[in-house]
Amino acid sequence: MASEPLALDIEKEPSGPLFLAIADAITRDIMRGRLKPGARLPGTRALARALGVHRNTVDAAYQELMTQGWLHAEPARGTFVAEDLPESMAEPVSVSVPREPATVRPHLAFSDGAPDPRLVPDKALARAFRRALLSPAFRGGADYGDARGTPVLRHALSSYLASDRGVVADPARLLITRGSQMALFLAARAAVKPGQAIAVEEPGYPLAWEAFRAAGASVRGIPVDAGGLSVAALEAAIESDPRIAAVYVTPHHQYPTTVTMGAARRLKLLDTVERHGITLIEDDYDHEYRFEGRPVLPLAARAPAGLPLIYVGSLSKLLSPGIRLGYAMAPEPLLTRMAAARAAIDRQGDAPLEAALADLIRDGDLGRHARKARRIYRARRDVLASALSAHLGGRIFFDRPAGGLALWLHCENVSADAWAERAGVAGLALLPGTHFALDRAAPQALRLGYAALDEGQIARAVDILARSLPD
């Protein structure tokens, strides 16, 4: 069956990531009846070419829609509109011959590493939020607040970063954002001029690339090895490409491979950035979740004075993706430029939420939650590692990560894309290496984000994974 031609109605300047705008446009076409159940969609390469976007962006949109149940993939055939669409879909106005309702398969997903929202300290958060809503500061406030965020949270974060990560953060140098994604966009707007480039890890984080492109920068991939970003390759890229004005790294638990950059390479990276006069954007991804040994200090904790370093973090990974709270620390004039860009797109943050989270930090509730979550996620990591070894030991290999909420699974003589397609048909959503590739050949690997699955769900997911292994 030929694929349906798609002329998607996508906003010219979407407020969020481009892949979500593409996913929303496809969803609208399904709900309007333009895309019928069972219709075949164009391949990711063809649709990317038609839309003028990177193939990874379309792949991310398809993966999102498969996770939500709008699409499904069939090995060697393609991607199709689901026959059993999500219950939220409105019934079409004109109905053809009635069919028997399709059986809805239980759906599981190895996410990209999202936390489990079931673990949110909801009672403590609700109490703190209620106090914030009833406080004189909120009820008596008749004007907008500071675009950099509420002073109470900036002071609380300053203490938290100093005690938990060894980062000396003056509250005046902190900017509160709606998640780390906004912080990355603002960092690029402040550090890079249109036409300049940001060096990024490859394989790496596609949503960061989207944020940088939206800010007017191009991205250039730098290979990642067992020690993280290759500083030698970065040096060569800077010397050959004068457009590179910044480098983006996730040194603590590299996304997606989970490797940790060692101390010697960190020092070499800081030296390279300083010598070439570029900006370092450090995304301290999953710092909270270190299971063996002490967490490695961030680059921001040992950077020489005056280095243009933008440090990005998030409280969303400690709580839930739906609680949008990120932050950035930067020197002047970078911070002023970031705050001005933030004010232009989002006048200020959520003052009651910021006050509530400041309460959780000061009262110790956030620290207690982090310790509890680490114990639970460590147990889930161990269950996943044991199940993978028992079911797939001869066909795959992996290093048990010392931290983070995902596992990087290397495939032995197996197509990761084909495996992901087969698993999707069986009811398990996977993220293959193509999702994280920029310019180079995609790694034959799968990123298994396990944190949002309990131990029973992990066992069922690994069973589907093993049964879906291509011959």
Each language-model region and where it sits:
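Helix-loop "lid/cap" segments that line or gate small-molecule binding pockets
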Residues: 157, 327, 355-363
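Short glycine-rich anion-binding loops that position phosphate/pyrophosphate groups of nucleotides
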Residues: 115, 251-255, 317
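Conserved core of the PLP fold type I
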Residues: 139-277, 288-306, 310, 377
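N-terminal basic, amphipathic alpha-helical segments
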Residues: 1-133, 137, 142, 146, ...
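Active-site PLP attachment segment
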Residues: 76, 302-337
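A generic "structured core" feature
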Residues: 207-210, 276, 280, 290, ...
